[in-house]
């Protein structure tokens, strides 16, 4: 089955689902209206993707206009620098760890969220011999922690489901790069600890969301 953007338990809304399982019911069938803020973030991600896939530097794209969801985003020197800051972190980690670098990797999450075909996207995934790393670019102003971050935990666990079949990783690492804060935050732990955290925090939340949806469906059927 082809992958789909997750709706019932999207990784980006995982914290909201944990705190309020009923939010899945309220958001059911709704499409989020595009915003200039989200469009701008997507444009910065696109510059970073070009750099990592083409082996270029972000400054090469200054002046280009990237259209996302009806909004035009110019690649200014400031945007290019933010993208480059992230790209430099990814390249440095890849050089240090070795292995394979995967850019914008689709990560099936249906095994965890129980939504057929659901998937997320890892901005950058490094598959080393002994370490698996998922790196996430956050282009916003709000500080985001990497430790115990549900979104990154889902991405990392899903990457582990794929690559852990043929690799015996000693550690897994979630990395958040926030250029606006000039910060790089990490969460490093053994694979079994990540699996335990998922089992204790994400699995129960998914079950509560499923229960809420079933309750509404039963009520609507009366």
Predicted features and spans:
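Mg2+/Mn2+-dependent nuclease catalytic core
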Residues: 97-216, 220
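Metal-dependent nuclease catalytic cores that hydrolyze phosphodiester bonds in DNA/RNA
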Residues: 1-132, 173, 185
């Amino acid at each position: 089955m082809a992958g789909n953007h997750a709706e019932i338990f999207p990784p980006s809304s995982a914290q909201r689902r944990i705190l309020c399982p009923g939010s899945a019911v309220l958001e059911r069938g709704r499409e989020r209206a595009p915003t200039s803020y989200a469009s701008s973030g997507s444009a910065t991600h696109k510059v970073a993707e070009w750099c990592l896939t083409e082996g270029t530097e972000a400054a090469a794209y200054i002046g280009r206009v990237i259209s996302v969801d009806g909004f035009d985003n110019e690649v200014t020197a400031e945007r290019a620098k933010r993208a480059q800051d992230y790209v430099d972190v990814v390249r440095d980690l890849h050089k240090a760890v070795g292995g394979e670098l995967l850019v914008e990797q689709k990560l099936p999450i249906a095994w965890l969220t129980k939504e057929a075909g659901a998937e997320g996207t890892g901005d950058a995934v490094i598959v080393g011999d002994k370490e698996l790393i998922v790196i996430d670019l956050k282009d916003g102003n709000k500080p985001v922690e990497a430790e115990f971050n549900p979104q990154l935990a889902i991405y990392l666990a899903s990457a582990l489901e794929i690559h852990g079949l043929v690799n015996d990783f000693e550690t897994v690492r979630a990395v958040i790069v926030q250029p606006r804060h000039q910060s790089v935050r990490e969460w490093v732990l053994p694979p079994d600890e990540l699996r335990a955290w998922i089992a204790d925090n994400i699995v129960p939340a998914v079950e509560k969301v499923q229960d809420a949806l079933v309750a509404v469906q039963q009520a609507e059927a009366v």
